[in-house]
Amino acid sequence: MAEEKKHYMTLEGKKKLEEELEYLKTERRKEVVERIKIARSFGDLSENSEYDSAKEEQAFVEGRISQIEKMIRNAEIIEESEGDANVVSLGKTVKFVEIPDGEEEEYTIVGSAESDPFEGKISNDSPMAQSLLGHTIDDVVIVNTPGGEMEVKILEIR
C-alpha cells in the first residue's frame, strides 16, 4: 500500500477538524437518517425526490467523515517554533509589500486542510506560498498569483 500523504496543520486546525468530525458523527448523521425515514414514509422510492436528496446528503456526510478521519490520521502538526525564525516556512506569518504599488499584505502559511484566504491563511501548496517559502526578510520575490506574477519585498516573518 502506498504511503498516505501527510496533512500539515496547526494544533488549532486539527482541533477544528476534530470538532467537525464529532458534529458530523453525533448530530448530522442522525439528522440525515431521520430525513431518510421521513422520506421513506412517502411511499414509492423510485420517484421520491425527498428520499433521493436525503440519500445524496448521507453520502456527502459519510464522505466528509471519511475525509476528516484520514486527514486526522495523517496529520503532521506544525509547531510554531519549528525552523529558523527568519525564514518563511510552514506555520509562519509573512508580511510583504507589493512593488511598486506599496500595498502591504500578510498571510500565514498553513496546510491545505486549514487554508482560508479570507482569514489570511494560505495553503503551503498554493503558488503564492510556494514562491515565498525559504525566503528571508528583505528578499524581493516574484510571487505567482491567479492574476499573474507580482514582485514583493518581505517585510516581516513571525
From Swiss-Prot:
GO molecular function: DNA binding; RNA polymerase binding
Keyword annotations from UniProtKB, A to Z: Coiled coil, DNA-binding, Transcription, Transcription regulation
Keyword Protein biosynthesis among UniProt keywords: no
Similarity field: Belongs to the GreA/GreB family.
Protein name: Transcription elongation factor GreA
Gene3D superfamilies listed in its UniProt record: Transcription elongation factor, GreA/GreB, C-terminal domain, Transcription elongation factor, GreA/GreB, N-terminal domain
GO BP of this protein: DNA-templated transcription elongation; regulation of DNA-templated transcription elongation
Tree of life domain: Bacteria
Coiled-coil parts of chain: 10-76
Organism: Halalkalibacterium halodurans (strain ATCC BAA-125 / DSM 18197 / FERM 7344 / JCM 9153 / C-125) (Bacillus halodurans)
Role this protein plays: Necessary for efficient RNA polymerase transcription elongation past template-encoded arresting sites. The arresting sites in DNA have the property of trapping a certain fraction of elongating RNA polymerases that pass through, resulting in locked ternary complexes. Cleavage of the nascent transcript by cleavage factors such as GreA or GreB allows the resumption of elongation from the new 3'terminus. GreA releases sequences of 2 to 3 nucleotides.
Matches recorded under InterPro entries: GreA/GreB_C_sf, TF_GreA/GreB_CS, Tscrpt_elong_fac_GreA, Tscrpt_elong_fac_GreA/B, Tscrpt_elong_fac_GreA/B_C, Tscrpt_elong_fac_GreA/B_fam, Tscrpt_elong_fac_GreA/B_N, Tscrpt_elong_fac_GreA/B_N_sf
